[in-house]
C-alpha cells in the first residue's frame, strides 16, 4: 500500500549524473519521486530509485527545454494529488567551442534548457508551494557561473544567471515558508563533457568530482535550508579567488581549460 504521507519530490535531469544521484538520495531519505529527463533511460533509472526506497516513482520522458515539456512534468506530479515537498531543478546542458563556431540552434537549446525551462517549471511549482507556505527548491547552478567562460561562454552565462536568480527568489520567498538553495558544483564525473563536445579539453580530460558526493552535498544543503553550497574544497577556493580576480584574467584562465585541443597541451 502506498503511503501518501511521504513527501514528494520532483527531480529533473534524473536519468544520469548529478540528477540521478539526487533522486537516489531523495529515495533513500523517504521521498517519493516524479523524475524527468529527455531520454528513455529515465524509465530504467526509475527502477533504481524504487530499489533505493521510493514507494512511488513516476518517470516522465519529456523535453525540459520547452514549456510543453515542463507542463507534461508538472501535470504528472499534479495527477498524484499530493503536494510537491521539494523541487530539484537539475536539468542542464553544456556546449563547448567558441561562440561564433557554435550552431545557434544548439546555443538556443542550452538557454532554453538551463534558463527558460528551469524558470518555467519553478514558476509553476513554487506558486503551489507559496500557497501552502511550505516547500524546498534546489537549483543546480555551477562554479562556472563565477567565471567568464571562454569557449563555454553560453553555458557559463546561464549558470551565472541561475546562481543569481536563486538568491533573488530566496529573498522573495523568505516570508513564505519556501526555501531556495543553489548547488554550485565544479567539474563532475558525468556524461556532461562528452555531450558538450569537450572531451579534448583540459577540463574535459581532467580529474573530476564524484557525482554522488555532489548530490549528497546539495541534498543536505537543501534540507538545512541553506542559500548556497559549493561542493568540494577546491571549488570553494576557486570561487573565493574568482570574487577578487579581474574578469579578463578569469576568461584567460578559462581558455586554458576549455579551448578545444587543450587536453594535449
Question: Where would I find each of the regions flagged by the language model?
Answer:
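Conserved NAD(P)H cofactor-binding loop of Rossmann-fold oxidoreductase domains
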Residues: 90-95
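Residue(s) in the substrate-gating loop at a strand-loop-helix junction
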Residues: 142
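Conserved glycine-rich cofactor-binding loop
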Residues: 15-16
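C-terminal helical subdomain
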Residues: 182, 202-239
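Conserved glycine-rich Rossmann-like NAD(P)H-binding loop of the short-chain dehydrogenase/reductase
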Residues: 29-45
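Active-site helix of classical SDR
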Residues: 122, 158
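Substrate-binding pocket helix/loop in short-chain dehydrogenase/reductase
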Residues: 98-111
Amino acid at each position: 500500500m502506498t503511503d501518501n504521507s511521504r513527501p514528494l519530490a520532483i527531480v529533473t535531469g534524473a536519468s544520469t549524473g548529478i540528477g540521478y544521484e539526487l533522486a537516489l538520495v531523495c529515495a533513500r531519505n523517504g521521498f517519493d519521486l516524479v523524475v524527468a529527463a529527455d531520454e528513455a533511460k529515465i524509465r530504467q533509472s526509475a527502477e533504481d530509485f524504487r530499489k533505493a526506497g521510493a514507494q512511488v516513482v513516476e518517470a516522465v520522458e519529456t523535453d525540459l527545454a520547452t514549456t510543453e515539456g515542463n507542463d507534461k512534468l508538472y501535470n504528472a506530479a499534479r495527477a498524484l494529488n499530493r503536494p510537491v515537498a521539494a523541487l530539484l531543478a537539475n536539468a542542464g546542458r553544456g556546449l563547448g567551442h567558441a561562440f561564433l563556431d557554435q550552431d545557434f540552434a544548439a546555443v538556443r537549446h542550452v538557454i532554453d534548457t538551463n534558463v527558460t525551462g528551469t524558470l518555467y517549471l519553478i514558476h509553476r511549482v513554487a506558486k503551489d508551494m507559496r500557497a501552502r507556505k511550505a516547500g524546498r527548491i534546489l537549483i543546480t547552478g555551477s562554479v562556472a557561473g563565477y567565471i567568464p567562460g571562454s569557449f563555454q561562454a553560453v553555458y557559463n552565462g546561464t549558470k551565472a544567471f541561475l546562481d543569481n536568480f536563486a538568491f533573488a527568489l530566496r529573498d522573495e520567498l523568505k516570508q513564505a515558508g519556501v526555501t531556495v538553495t543553489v548547488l554550485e558544483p565544479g567539474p563532475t564525473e558525468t556524461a556532461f563533457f562528452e555531450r558538450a563536445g569537450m572531451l579534448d579539453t583540459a577540463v574535459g580530460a581532467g580529474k573530476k568530482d564524484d557525482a554522488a558526493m555532489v548530490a549528497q552535498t546539495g541534498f543536505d544543503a537543501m534540507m538545512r535550508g541553506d542559500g548556497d553550497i559549493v561542493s568540494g574544497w577546491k571549488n570553494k577556493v576557486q570561487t573565493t579567488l574568482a570574487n577578487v580576480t579581474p574578469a579578463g584574467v578569469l576568461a584567460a584562465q578559462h581558455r586554458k581549460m576549455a579551448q578545444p585541443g587543450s587536453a594535449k597541451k
